[in-house]
Amino acid sequence: MSTGFNAQSFLRTVTSSAGVYRMYDVKGDVIYVGKAKDLKKRLSSYFRKNLGNVKTQALVSHIHHIDVTLTHSETDALLLENDYIKQYMPKYNVLLRDDKSYPYILLSQHEHPRLAYHRGPQREKGHYFGPYPNGGAVRESLHLMQKLFPIRQCDDLYYKSRTRPCLQYQLSRCSAPCVGKVSNAEYDEQVKLASLFLKGKDKQVISELVAKMEEAAEQQAYEQAARFRDQIMALRRVAEQQEVSGNTGDMDVIGVHYASGIACFHLLFIREGKIFGSRSYYPTVPAQTDIEEVLRSFLLQFYLNADIQRTIPKEVVISHHFEELHELEAAVSEALNKKFSIKTNVRADRASFLRLAITNATNAVMTRLSHKNTVEQRFVLLEEILELNAPIQRMECFDISHTMGESTVASCVVFNREGPHKAEYRRYNIEGITPGDDYAAMKQAISRRFDKIDASGKIPDILFIDGGLGQLRIAQQIVDEKFVNLDKAPQLIGVAKGESRKPGLETLIFGDTETSFSLEDDSPALHLIQHIRDESHRFAITGHRNRRQKTRNTSTLESIPGIGPKRRKALLQHLGGLQEVKGASVAELAKVPGISIEMAQTIHDALRG
């Protein structure tokens, strides 16, 4: 492909200064951003006669023009490069999409503080501990904290409504401050110890508890002394399991594995000398990108584009060394205005945890490659069976779900050559049809999916319909209408269940000819069809159940005079669900915020008939 770019003429205008360059294609899109301490030398390397790298060849073939920005230093160039990558998301750069927020444990500032899971803006007053790599790590920690410190974890609405201790008190996981089972002083002491524990000060917590145990024993308060003893033993067991080293502090340990175009960066988050958990990252890597660029790009984007809620440690240990490591170290330190070091040659505890991170990264890549190869083989076999002239790039499958015609939902799931593409999944709430009419539901769903389709839209190569010939005919009719003026249309295939409805006995039906065929029950191509069919079924059922529950909750309560969305929500949250609301007494209903005794009587009468 020729874009008319005159490289020699351009290079005559480039100086040997440090700076950043942006490469554009003929449409004006930025396709690559790079930096160099010597721009002339770096840019000249793209236009040598013998370019060994396939990625570079492809990149150069699409260059229409190049913009250059000079900087005072290589550190400035690194920072500007990162800003441009974040702004333009160029197709030939390594891109890290880390758009998930990080969860924390919140210790609130109430009279009786609570421990809670928190994700998002830190608006509530209190102490935030973390960040944790994922929600599972937070929930695991909260479960552990319940066993160690009898502090409430219930929400305020539930806490204020209690008239007697809940099950957590019976399990010795909460001291029931809601009903005065513990003094404020005792509760505050446990809150203080929990805070110290979350800060990693296990030894101080244990020392204070030992002193309290001895004091209780001296005063012959043996039951209280036994409680402190049990708490100390539990804390010691946990401390032994979590302890990394006495002097590690805050640190990220990163194991890297890169193979066949898939890169995994597995991070161990160590804060206050404890492992908070781990998380794997998979940056988007253009084909034939060398490992040095993958490493540099990941570290640059991960630490410079960090969510404001994610704390950056002073030390990072990584499994690979690369040429620009020290320049990147300086750039991050300058941008964050704090000391930041990257180490690759480590010993003792750090080496042990680095080996663990590398093992996890390697296993993650191998698993992805195995899955990728398996899915690819299934696609190839399906192409052979269907005698297609071109590879399948996109498949979709539709299914309908309802209960006796109630709350009908249609699902559309999407598979590409790597398997399920969940970002493209869609659900359609079906309206205005005769309840239970699956044909009308399918017609509405297919019509809405392809309502404004054109040649530039996302057209599936194959469209599976989970159903028999009747539903397939409806779908084929709609597709014929919507694609009448387009050169390409999807191949429709119905997936009808066999006589006994057992997997492996499915009958497949072509939509255009209505001819049917079957595949062997051990055929990988059939397994691929079953996978997308089962996924569409699952997605439709979960959507239907959610819609049905919402409809039933809403219609039952909001049919009562005086009950709107706000009061309905308060009733369901406070009492735990519709069945609990139905079973509540007038007195219990009246304890819900916003519900008077008169309104409680009205609700009680309406629900009891």
UniProtKB/Swiss-Prot annotation:
Pfam families given in the database record: GIY-YIG (PF01541), HHH_5 (PF14520), UVR (PF02151), UvrC_RNaseH (PF22920), UvrC_RNaseH_dom (PF08459)
Domain of life from the UniProt record: Bacteria
Gene Ontology CC terms: cytoplasm; excinuclease repair complex
SMART domains given in the database record: GIYc, HhH1
Disulfide bonds: none
Ranges for domain UVR: 203-238
Location within or outside the cell: Cytoplasm
Swiss-Prot/TrEMBL keywords: Cytoplasm, DNA damage, DNA excision, DNA repair, Excision nuclease, SOS response
Biological process (GO), any one: DNA damage response
Domain GIY-YIG, residue spans: 16-94
Quaternary structure and partners: Interacts with UvrB in an incision complex.
Main function: The UvrABC repair system catalyzes the recognition and processing of DNA lesions. UvrC both incises the 5' and 3' sides of the lesion. The N-terminal half is responsible for the 3' incision and the C-terminal half is responsible for the 5' incision.
Protein family membership: Belongs to the UvrC family.
Protein known as: UvrABC system protein C
Organism of this sequence: Shewanella oneidensis (strain ATCC 700550 / JCM 31522 / CIP 106686 / LMG 19005 / NCIMB 14063 / MR-1)
Gene name linked to the record: uvrC
